[in-house]
Amino acid sequence: SVRSGARASMPGMMDTILNLGLNDEVAEGMVKKTGNPHFVYDSYRRFVQMYGDVVMGLKPVNKEDIDPFEAIIEKVKEEQGVTLDKDLSVESLKKLVELFKAAIKEQTGQDFPTNPIDQLWGAICAVFRSWMNERAILYRKMEGIPDEWGTAVSVMAMVFGNMGETSATGVCFSRDAGNGEDLFNGEYLINAQGEDVVAGIRTPQQITKIGSQRWAERAGISEEERVTKYPSMEEAMPEIYKELDALQTKLENHYRDMQDMEFTVQEGKLWFLQTRNGCLLYTSDAADD
């Protein structure tokens, strides 16, 4: 993955590239190594889409504009008769890779790069460029962050939340950001990657059981349906939840501030991707603690 590393945290303002390094040859090798072609080609189609959006300029400028990749995904899902991306077959995922590459060629006149080094430099330059995108400039003005600070770019080994039902990805907070209540909370998705949690493609599930019950009550969902379709991590992955809960407490105690954390679970193993001091709207409870 290729991520920004600005001096001051700018959540969601900068661009990120995941699954970098994939091409047809690497994909075949990963299938042999993992025995999981669905995971490999899901990662591959995600990479081509993200690279096309961020590096090659196909990301829609306005919300009203049609994302060419999303239009292709919807068409392929309709052809296969499924509603969720995660239910696409391996053949459909392979088809998406080729259709995405064709869309890039058609709209930019350039081929999708297959050399991993070319991919890497393209991604690094794109993340540096994103420092000056419209939303980042506006955010810095609001937060009083100087443009001259610039950003670093971090190149990190990937861990994968989309390797199956024992993998997941999520975001969590060590306390309630709205009122400072000492209540661990957050959202996660099984068999997904980071952007899925905030993209609205699937309904994220709650980290804690109490959070899940509160969410279901607000949404008018019965307890039976909640447990069946939207179980909390505390219920669906109890051992991972215990580890996550212990570590979020440790991180808040260490930094002496509310923590905003991102994590991935790869085949039953928990990995922290990032933690940063969160923004409390009301801090008296946190101050008392």
Q: Where are each of the predicted segments found?
A:
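Nucleotide/phosphate-binding sheet-loop regions of phosphoryl- and nucleotidyl-transfer enzymes
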Residues: 1-284
